[in-house]
Structures are given as C-alpha cells and as structure tokens.
A protein has these predicted regions:
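Terminal low-complexity tails and localization/encapsulation signals of metabolic enzymes
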Residues: 1-15, 248-249, 331-405
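N-terminal helix-loop segment corresponding to the beta1-alpha1 unit
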Residues: 1-200, 230, 377, 383-405
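Glycine-rich beta-alpha junction loops
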Residues: 46, 132-133, 211-216, 251-253, ...
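Short, surface-exposed loop/helix-turn segments at secondary-structure junctions
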Residues: 52-55, 225-234, 271, 335-349
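A short glycine-threonine-serine/GTX helix/turn-capping micro-motif
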Residues: 171-182, 204-206, 234-244, 253-255, ...
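Substrate-binding/catalytic subdomain of NAD(P)-dependent oxidoreductase enzymes
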Residues: 192-234
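Aromatic-enriched alpha-helical interface/lid elements that frame and gate functional surfaces
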Residues: 243-319, 323
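Conserved PLP cofactor-binding pocket of PLP-dependent enzymes
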Residues: 317-338
C-alpha cells in the first residue's frame, strides 16, 4: 500500500484519489475513509463538487456534501489544463485507488482514463461508476438518481398495494438518493475486494460499476419475486413486503412485521382478534384465504387506532411480535438507544457550525476506526498535498495563475 497519513481503521495506509461528484462515488469513498483510508478529493478550482450546493445548506456547504465527504482532504486541480492534468497523474502514480463517476469516455478525453493512469501506476485499482456501464445502448445516457430509480425498478415497486393485492398505476420514487447510495455500497465493497486481490498478487484492475446493475441486484431478491420465479402465475405481489402498512395509533405511528406464523398469531392476540381460525394458522392457509386475512388485518388497524403508541407497542412486545415506532431523523437523534450506542457523532465545521453524522455502522474489534473528521473546505489541502509531491510554493502559485489548481 502507499504511504498515507495514518488514520485508524482496517484500511489504514490505503490512499484513494476521489474525482467523483454528487453522491455515488463520494459516498463510496466516504465509507472507505471511515475505515481508515486516506481519501484525497480532487475538485474543480473555484466551484468544487456540485454536491456542495444541493439541498439543505448552512455556511455555503450542504448537508449532502458533509455526509459524503467526511474524513477526506480536498485538493483543487483542473485536468482540462495540461499542467493540472500532469500534477493529477503524479498524484495518481502514488495512489492505490482512483475513483470517478463520469459518463464513459469523459476521462479518456481528458487524458486520465484507465490506460493513462495505469501507464504511471500499473497496480492501480481504477473505478468507473456510471449510470448504465461502458457498453450497451444506454451507455452514454446521462443518469442521476431518479433516472436509475425509474429504469432499475425502484419507482415501479413503490406503487401502492391495494387491499385486494393489486397495485395502483402511479410509480413513486423513494424520497432519498437510494440508487446513488446503493451503488456506493456496492462500490466500496468491490473496491475492498479488488484491493484484496491485489494484495495476494493478482495486480490492479479496472472496475466498472453501473448504477442500473447495482439497483437491479439490490432489488431483485425481495421485490421481484415473479421475475426470479419465471413460471409462477403472478397471483401474488412480487414483493413480499409490499403489503406492509404502518399502524396509526392515537398519538403516533408504528409498524408490526408479522412474518413468521407465531408473529401473525401474536399480532392478532395483541389487538384482540381471535387467532384460532384455521385460515390464519400458516403461510399456506393465509395465502389461500387472502381476502379473509385482509379483513383481519383491517380489524387490527381499527383497534390500533384507538390505542396510544405506548400501549400498542407494549401489547405487541408482550406477544414478541417484531414492532417499532416511526421516528423522524430528529427523533432518532434523541432516541435512548441511539444515544447509548453512540450512533451519531457531532463536530464543528468552520463554515457550517455544528455537524452531526452517523458513525460507520461496522464496529471493528481489533482495527477500530477513529472519530469522524469534518468535510474539507474547497481546496483546503491543496498546498500540503502538492508539497508532498515536491512542488514548492512558487510552483503551486504558478498552477493557480494558470487555473490548474
């Protein structure tokens, strides 16, 4: 691995050059940084990553940028300027992982495609994230999150399921950048796999990851049942969770998830419904008598509406039915369990003030990650990183005069 500023965590010593923008690549690299990698974010001089300006912002920096760029260093370089491209390739020669998320062909036209970077660093793990991948009829289509939610099945599978098991006609988007973040999860896992392959002597490689592929892979197991089993009659919804609805209580909302037979019968008892009917006893009998089961479920919703949240949850927990309350992000931040496990960390940012973010969810016993560090200001580390390459202050100033840094 390359020499990098030591951060604690299992990826300590790994250096990542992050040329990506928005959410997919930046979030993938943030996950690597959480685990100890030294991530150098390369941004456009004077403007930076577009994510700095999207959504809720304070002090000129968005919440999205803070969340996707924690634990990183920021360098400004413009590969459109020959001098900027030359310095970027010098950095690439000293990195383990190179990440970009532009349309196929963009990096090649700039002279920083895989072949260019491999020429200076044969063992590099070069990661290309795009909407549809490098080939196929959609390869050169532009793609943001909602485009991939539409193509990948997310929007269609969010249609409302009616009591009779049919769905309405209106597709719905998941109200967050779900396609971006799912892709980022696959990317961070694939990067660590490629680093392992390199560590055991298989060399570097070019890793392509299409957002469409990531969403399809993520969705297929539990939301595309009739496409997995191609010979079914299609009488059941493809998603076995599509009929789940939250319970409205007198003073709030909650959920019960009666997946196992004992849980379903416990749900009935918790809300005073007779659980002895033979049509309710097993998955098979409930599937056979779906209309009757729908009536039973509507009864549980009616009973629940007259209970307080505390009373309803207590009744469900007494029957050991998996259940919970619906919390907003603000509620979660104050939840006693979240506080007890240190789910969120707060730090100060010179422009945005107090910033609160979740820690990495994996807690490593022998290689623990350190506390989160704040997202960088635009170009905050340009001088120090370029000095590490051997550039003196006059050379760095010259790059700025040229618009290269």
């Amino acid at each position: 691995m390359t020499t990098a500023p030591e951060r604690p965590g299992p990826l300590a010593g790994v250096r990542v050059l992050d040329l990506s923008i928005a959410a997919t690549g930046p979030y993938a690299c943030a996950l690597l940084a959480d685990q100890g990698a030294d991530v150098i974010k390369v941004e456009r001089p004077g403007f930076g990553d577009i994510a700095r300006y999207v959504g809720v912002a304070h002090g000129g920096v968005s919440a999205l940028y803070h969340a996707c760029n924690r634990n990183k260093r920021s360098v400004t370089l413009d590969p459109h300027v020959p001098e900027g491209r030359a310095v970027l390739l010098e950095l690439a020669a000293r990195t383990d992982v190179f990440v970009q998320n532009f349309r196929p062909g963009v990096m090649e036209r700039l002279g920083i495609g895989y072949a260019d970077v491999r020429a200076v660093n044969p063992d590099v793990v070069y990661v290309s994230i795009s909407g549809f991948g490098p080939d196929g009829p959609y390869a050169h289509k532009g793609a943001y999150d909602t485009v991939i939610q539409a193509y990948g099945g997310f929007a269609a599978t969010q249609r409302e399921v009616l009591p009779d098991g049919t769905t309405d006609d209106e597709p719905r988007f998941i109200k967050q950048t779900a396609a971006d973040k799912v892709t980022a999860l696959y990317a961070s896992q694939a990067i660590t796999a490629a680093l392992y392959a390199r560590a055991v002597g298989r060399g570097g490689q070019h890793l392509h990851l299409a957002m469409l592929d990531a969403v399809a892979s993520f969705l297929w197991a539990d939301a595309a049942g009739n496409e997995v089993l191609m010979d079914t009659d299609g009488s059941l919804p493809s998603s076995f969770v599509s009929t789940f609805r939250p319970y409205r209580f007198r003073d709030g909302w909650g959920i019960a998830t009666p997946t196992a037979d004992k849980d379903f019968l416990g749900l009935c008892r918790a809300f005073g419904v007779d659980d002895s009917d033979p049509r309710l006893q097993t998955h098979a009998t409930r599937r056979e008598h779906r209309e009757f089961v729908a009536e039973v479920m509507e009864t549980t919703y009616a009973v629940a509406a007259g209970l307080t949240t505390a009373a309803a949850i207590a009744a469900l927990e007494a029957e050991t039915v998996p259940c919970g309350v619906v919390l907003s992000p603000a509620d979660l931040a104050a939840d006693p369990h979240a506080l007890a496990v240190g789910l969120l960390e707060t730090h100060d940012h010179p422009d945005s003030g107090r910033v609160r973010l979740p820690r990495h969810p994996a807690r490593f016993a022998t290689t623990p990650a350190g506390p989160l560090t704040r997202a960088p200001r635009l170009g905050e580390h340009t001088d120090s990183v370029l000095a590490d390459l051997g550039l003196d202050p006059a050379e760095i100033a010259r790059l700025r005069e040229l618009g290269a840094a």
